[in-house]
Amino acid sequence: MKLAVNLSLMYTELPFLERFAAARKDGFNAVEIQFPYDTPILDIQQALRENNLQCVLINLPAGDLMQGGEGLAAVPGKTAEYAAAMVECLAYARALKVSCVNVLPGRCTDENKRVFYLDTFKKNLVKTADSLAPFNITTTFEAINTRDMPDFL
């Protein structure tokens, strides 16, 4: 069995770049990072190299989702922001040599608009998969229960 540790959730008592060494010390060969975008690519590459780790997954930027907002991937009025997030994600994904990019659908607080949000998400997911496939990067999306994240699609 192969396991990857999520450095966004584990070793949170340590500064982010020190978590790579902790993961290696605990026997991990692979890591995932939810949102690496606050850390320069070169710093992450160095931490991976120094600790002989592979980054296997990152999330596509999700806008305000983690702060309680709707996010980006499914919001009809945020297609330009989503496109910009795709560009940033692709740069990180290629540089870090990840094999998977996770897209968080987001929230819809208006049940009457849910069908439009799902349609937007489907279109964005297809665009994302088409953009990442030439680099052998798999696009995934995550289902989150609505008790932990109300109104999640």
Language model region names:
Residues M1-R94, V98, V126, A133:
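N-terminal pre-domain/capping segments
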Residues L72-L153:
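Active-site acidic/histidine proton-transfer and metal-coordination neighborhood
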